[in-house]
């Protein structure tokens, strides 16, 4: 009986019954736990908050979409002229703006380079306008350089050659005298000349119109006399040597000036940006203007010579030694210096943006004694104020600090963040022991990052740049979005691929986002150390004032990392809990069976449906463990720490990077047409912006859903396809070509050659081959590759220029008379010569010197240049200078500029003079020039080492002079018969027959050059 009972108890049916009972008990317990959870279920509002802010795929994806859209909108609004600038409502300001706009229309009526009659028209218009305005005031006066009192001769800085420039100035100067004569004056400067190919509305018509607006304001009734004297410099010939500004340095009024505001235009419309400032002391006053817009990123570009064009700022700062700022329009550069820089392509708001900011800056500096006025008595203040300025703006808010202060902030953050982080890590890993980070966790982000950047670099330079190298000209934003989406997708695949391969690895998914945040902050920490070290030694040529966003990106990542570390340091977790539950909410996305999101688990509970055996909460565990861990993970899913980290890191980082990148690329992308080096730089910058923009999103990439992944794939695919299909040049983003028609009288007296400069690989050849004159005459197009990716294409043309109505032969355009050959044949004497250049209706000529021994000499043999005043000149076979040659010794003549008693302009340079540029105001007055140069035996060291005496010959020491003169007059030489007398018909042809995606600019000081070679 006992055996029977015992056998019955161990029978399969009995064991099945016990199993069923146990299962029933567990099911009952599970149901009770679920019921307990459901009974404590929060209300609808709390569930909605949890649904939005819980760490779920849908929530993260929603946050990412909102961030991207908000970033695009905010940056567009901040940089938008229409949104950020409002037209004046004040009656006086409205009147000033209307008058300035009318002035701008008058100034931009025609092209007005220094080499054109249009330049005289603008000068005369401004002179009449100034005279009218100053007649209203008792404390305003003017001065005109046209009386020849400010002609100068000076050395022009150039790395390739030594050039001396003679310039006759016709600047227009206005002095608004201040009530306190002890205060140093403020200079406001703009130039009224344009290039020959442009109407000069933005460059620099709006600067000139702003000067007139300032003058209009201070000459208006009811406006008090300023405390500080204000000098307005309407200067000429900025475009080809910054000559008007250089001339002003020699004017008596310059001695009063200590500060300056330079108004310029290196783009065509839009907003006027604060390009750069000499120092913090003066830049800080720009924060008081009503619509501040600027970034020291452009300052870094200028100071490091990434931007090749220069402004008068350079003259005032480097040669004049005064302190000020450079305010200019900065985009787009493909319209800059072309016929599209006209009144029809700009907005009155652009003028008001420059004019209002200029008025505000002038008002704040001139209405009071500023701290810079007293720096001579305060050395400490002087040291700080003369530091480089770091500045930026956003939504008309302006931020500026001195470089030393940013260095101090950087050093503090670099030290404090690790000091806080290290103790927290010690607490977490040595005491709490609640966070497991293994080898895979530590290396997967660096591996993913490096692989993604390498692939991105290959795609950028070997695919995009090879297929469509000029695409950034029209679509840099498309390339950024393509690379941005690709970079996110690559990291998504690499990170989750590693998770999939090592899915059985203990602790693989343990707070992955925090690991990535910490590693990202470490990368920024290293970069910030390098940047701070360089900023502490900041100088021109090695400027780092534009790298200020690094500290902000580092701080944002560090705050997110510290928040995560604090959370772990206060978390209570038992070892048993760790052993049984090493999985974490951040699951890999490639394994659907093992990694369901929390939202689905919660839905199962609330619906009463059975819990799936493949739940992510605990693999291969008992049902009670499943239930316990499920409820635990559901509670974890309600954690909002991720959302705090996301909000702290991602939105602001995206905004900073995108705003900085947008300003940088929109200002530089057109320079891809200027050189191969610029092209490489732009592609590198595009790649940098794409990577930096994507990095803040990477810690949260484990939780993006299929919708966002699909969107990224679509963006990448559409962008990649556009690389093959989209043209880099269109009507809004034209191909920029540079034109000059050359006549070389040594080669032909009836044939001219059109030279066109552009980038190699551009459609330039096709454009030129389609010109009617080439097709009709069957002239060949000769193209030669130049340095740095440029190309010169030339063709002969029968479209002769009509530079002067009285000239019928090319030889009449340029006649060089040799007035005097060497004054002595003595082999050790100073050789000298003298020429007169006759050119009709001309203002600019350039002379290049060589010698029969030039190739063997390390420097030019010309040492002295003399430019004669014809009314003082007395021709004599015995005199080169106004004194006897026997009385003249080279050592007695001071190096640099000097004048003799007859008014001759003399410049001496012992290092040699390679070129001389002559600029005069008279249209028909000849150039009268003298030279002194060294004979071979005096200048050549090699002669000392020769055993044989080479006899002295005059021919051996002849001075060769290449004379080239330029004309910039467009329009018609004879208004009675316009169809036949177009001044430069070859230029008219390229304008008329080029496609609408081509814009034309000048290559030289004029659109036509005539050259001739002589020896003396």
Swiss-Prot record:
BP-aspect Gene Ontology terms: proteolysis
Annotated Low complexity bias: 612-622
UniProt cofactor(s): Zn(2+)
Entry binding sites for Zn(2+) 1: 191, 203, 264
List of catalytic residues: 238
Subcellular location: Vacuole membrane
One Gene Ontology term, aspect cellular component: vacuolar membrane
EC number from the UniProt entry: 3.4.-.-
One annotated GO molecular function: metal ion binding
Record InterPro entries: Fxna-like_M28_dom, M28_fam, Peptidase_M28, PFF1_C, PFF1_TM
Presence of keyword Oxidoreductase: no
Positions in the Cytoplasmic compartment: 1-57, 430-438, 503-511, 569-646, 703-706
Highest taxon in the source lineage: Eukaryota
Gene3D superfamilies: Zn peptidases
Location of region: Disordered: 1-36, 598-622
Cofactor binding summary note: Binds 2 Zn(2+) ions per subunit.
Transmembrane parts of this sequence: 58-78, 409-429, 439-459, 482-502, 512-532, 548-568, 647-667, 682-702, 707-727
Record topological domains on the Vacuolar side: 79-408, 460-481, 533-547, 668-681, 728-1016
This protein's record includes keyword Disulfide bond: no
Membrane-topology descriptor: Multi-pass membrane protein
Residues that hold Zn(2+) 2 according to the record: 203, 239, 337
Keyword terms of this UniProt record: Glycoprotein, Hydrolase, Membrane, Metal-binding, Metalloprotease, Protease, Transmembrane, Transmembrane helix, Vacuole, Zinc
Record-stated family: Belongs to the peptidase M28 family.
Functional summary from the UniProt entry: May be involved in vacuolar sorting and osmoregulation.
Protein name: Vacuolar membrane protease
Species the sequence originates in: Debaryomyces hansenii (strain ATCC 36239 / CBS 767 / BCRC 21394 / JCM 1990 / NBRC 0083 / IGC 2968) (Yeast)
Lineage: Eukaryota, Fungi, Dikarya, Ascomycota, Saccharomycotina
């Amino acid at each position: 009986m006992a055996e029977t009972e015992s056998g019955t108890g161990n029978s399969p049916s009995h064991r099945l019954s016990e199993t069923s009972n146990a299962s029933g008990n567990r099911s009952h317990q599970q149901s009770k736990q679920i019921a307990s959870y459901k009974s404590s279920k929060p209300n609808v509002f709390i569930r909605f908050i949890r649904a939005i802010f819980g760490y779920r795929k849908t929530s993260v994806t929603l946050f990412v979409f909102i961030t991207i859209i908000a970033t695009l909108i905010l940056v567009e609004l901040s940089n938008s002229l229409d949104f950020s600038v409002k037209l004046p409502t004040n009656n006086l300001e409205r009147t000033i703006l209307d008058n300035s706009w009318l002035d701008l229309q008058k100034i931009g009526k025609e092209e007005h380079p220094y080499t054109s009659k249009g330049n005289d028209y603008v000068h005369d218009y401004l002179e009449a306008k100034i005279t009218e305005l100053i007649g209203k005031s008792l404390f305003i006066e003017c001065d005109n350089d046209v009386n020849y009192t400010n002609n100068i001769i000076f050395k022009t800085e150039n790395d390739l050659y030594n050039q001396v420039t003679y310039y006759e100035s016709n600047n227009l100067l206005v002095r608004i005298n201040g009530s306190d004569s002890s205060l140093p004056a403020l200079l406001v400067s703009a130039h009224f000349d344009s290039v020959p190919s442009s109407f000069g509305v933005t460059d620099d018509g709006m600067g000139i119109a702003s000067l007139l607006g300032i003058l209009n304001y201070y000459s208006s009734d009811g406006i008090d006399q300023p405390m500080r004297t204000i000098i307005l410099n309407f200067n000429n010939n900025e475009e080809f040597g910054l000559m008007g500004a250089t001339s002003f340095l020699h004017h008596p009024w310059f001695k009063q000036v200590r500060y300056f505001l330079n108004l310029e235009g290196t783009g065509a419309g839009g907003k006027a940006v604060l390009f750069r400032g000499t120092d913090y002391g003066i830049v800080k006053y720009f924060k008081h203007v009503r619509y501040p817009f600027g970034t020291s990123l452009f300052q870094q570009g200028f100071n490091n010579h990434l931007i090749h064009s220069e402004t008068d700022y350079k003259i005032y700062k480097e040669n004049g030694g005064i302190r000020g700022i450079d305010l200019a329009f900065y985009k787009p550069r493909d319209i800059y210096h072309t016929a599209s820089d006209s009144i029809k392509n700009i907005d009155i708001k652009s003028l008001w943006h420059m004019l209002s900011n200029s008025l505000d800056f002038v008002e704040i500096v001139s209405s009071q004694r500023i701290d810079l006025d007293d720096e001579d008595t305060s050395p400490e203040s002087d040291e700080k104020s003369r530091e480089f300025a770091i500045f930026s703006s956003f939504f008309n808010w302006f931020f500026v600090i001195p470089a030393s202060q940013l260095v101090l902030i950087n050093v503090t953050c670099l030290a404090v963040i690790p000091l806080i982080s290290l103790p927290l890590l010690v607490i977490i890993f040595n005491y709490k022991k609640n966070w497991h980070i293994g080898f895979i966790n530590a290396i997967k982000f660096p591996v993913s990052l490096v692989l993604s950047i390498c692939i991105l670099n290959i795609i950028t330079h070997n695919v995009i740049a090879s297929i469509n190298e000029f695409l950034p000209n029209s679509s840099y934003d498309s390339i950024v979005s393509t690379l941005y989406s690709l970079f996110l997708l690559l990291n998504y695949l690499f990170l989750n691929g590693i998770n999939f391969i090592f899915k059985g690895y203990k602790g693989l998914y343990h707070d992955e986002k925090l690991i990535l945040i910490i590693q990202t902050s470490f990368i920024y920490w290293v970069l910030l150390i390098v940047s701070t070290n360089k900023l502490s030694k900041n100088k021109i040529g090695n400027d780092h004032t534009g790298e200020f966003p690094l500290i902000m990106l580092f701080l944002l990542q560090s705050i997110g990392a510290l928040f995560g570390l604090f959370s772990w340091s206060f978390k209570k977790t038992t070892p048993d809990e760790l052993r049984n539950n090493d999985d974490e909410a951040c699951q890999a996305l490639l394994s659907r069976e093992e990694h369901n999101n929390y939202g689905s688990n919660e839905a199962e509970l609330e619906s009463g449906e059975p819990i799936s055996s493949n739940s992510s909460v605990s693999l291969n565990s008992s049902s009670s463990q499943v239930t316990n861990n499920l409820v635990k993970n559901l509670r974890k899913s309600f954690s909002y720490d991720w959302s705090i980290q996301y909000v702290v890191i991602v939105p602001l980082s995206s905004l900073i990077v995108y705003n900085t990148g947008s300003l940088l690329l929109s200002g530089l992308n057109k320079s891809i047409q200027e050189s191969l080096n610029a092209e490489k730089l732009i592609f590198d910058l595009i790649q940098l912006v794409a990577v930096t923009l994507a990095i803040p999103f990477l810690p949260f990439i484990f939780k993006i859903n299929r919708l966002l992944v699909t969107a990224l794939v679509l963006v990448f695919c559409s962008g990649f396809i556009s690389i093959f299909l989209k043209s880099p040049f269109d009507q809004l983003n034209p191909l920029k070509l540079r034109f000059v028609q050359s006549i070389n009288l040594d080669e032909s007296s009836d044939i001219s050659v059109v030279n066109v400069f552009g980038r190699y690989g551009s459609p330039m050849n096709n454009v030129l081959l389609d010109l009617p004159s080439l097709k009709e005459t069957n002239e060949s197009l000769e193209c030669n590759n130049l340095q740095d990716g440029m190309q010169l294409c030339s063709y002969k043309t029968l479209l002769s220029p009509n530079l002067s109505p009285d000239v019928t032969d090319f030889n009449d355009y340029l006649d060089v008379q040799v007035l005097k050959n060497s004054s002595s044949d003595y082999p050790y004497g100073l050789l000298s010569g003298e020429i007169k250049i006759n050119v009709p209706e001309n203002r600019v000529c350039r002379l290049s010197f060589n010698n029969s021994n030039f190739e063997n000499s390390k420097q030019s043999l010309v040492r002295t240049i003399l430019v004669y005043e014809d009314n003082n000149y007395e021709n004599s076979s015995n005199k080169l200078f106004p004194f006897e040659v026997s009385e003249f010794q080279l050592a007695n003549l001071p190096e640099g500029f000097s004048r003799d008693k007859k008014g001759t302009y003399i410049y001496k340079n012992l290092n040699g003079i390679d070129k001389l540029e002559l600029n005069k105001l008279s249209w028909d007055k000849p150039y009268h020039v003298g030279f002194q140069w060294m004979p071979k035996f005096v200048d050549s060291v090699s002669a000392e080492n020769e055993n044989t005496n080479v006899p002295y010959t005059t021919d051996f020491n002849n001075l060769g002079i290449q004379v080239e003169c330029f004309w910039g007059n467009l329009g018609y030489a004879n208004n009675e018969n316009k169809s036949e007398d177009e001044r430069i018909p070859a230029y008219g042809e390229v304008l008329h027959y080029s496609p609408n995606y081509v814009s034309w600019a000048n290559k030289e000081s004029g659109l036509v050059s005539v050259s001739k070679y002589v020896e003396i």
